[in-house]
Amino acid sequence: MEPVFRPMRRFKQALPEEECFRILTSAYRGFLSVIGDGGYPYTVPINFVFEDGKLYFHCAKEGHKLDALRACDKACFTVLDEPEKEADDWWYHVKSVICFGRVRILSDDADRIPRLIALGKKYFPDDYDTEADVFQNGSRAEMLEFTIDHLSGKAVREK
């Protein structure tokens, strides 16, 4: 039987797990892919927060993404680090992380509320009363927890 997750073909470009975690902590936007209608991939750009080895997203209470996750909890999440350009050259250094895992909808407010607050503070760390907004409006959002089964990171030099 073949392993579920393939090894990276260009293994010399692989990033260590700690670097993958750094990118997941610092990146601001990622792409969540689920198995959508008719078995087609459905990918959406999404804000997220990485805490305690898991990814958290918020979304509306209904829609394509939630329908897909209710049908199949398997998902893929991808982030790109900010590219760095080599001085006086065309080359860019780009790092990316791909996570495979399962997503569950957090239904207990004891789990949901702290994650919504953490997400808000990531994007509005100083100039916004995140906690008040979450307590006032948090019931209008779903909170998703992505448990990572496998991740890999890669550094490439692109021209």
Language model regions located:
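Broad gene-expression machinery/nucleic-acid interaction feature
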Residues: R29, T43-P45, K74, I98-F100, ...
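Short solvent-exposed loop/turn micro-motifs enriched in small/polar/acidic residues
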Residues: T25-A27, Y40-P41, D89-W90, S139
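Short beta-strand segments
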Residues: A27-K61, F77-T78
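Short, basic/aromatic recognition patches
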Residues: P3-F31
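Helix-adjacent hinge/juxtasegments
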Residues: H58, H64-W90
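Structural motif corresponding to alpha-helix initiation and N-cap regions
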Residues: E17, E62-G63
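A generic structural signal for nonpolar/aromatic side chains embedded in well-ordered alpha-helices
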Residues: I23-L24, A68-L69, L119
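Charged, gly/pro-rich active-site loop segments
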Residues: E2-K12, E84-K159
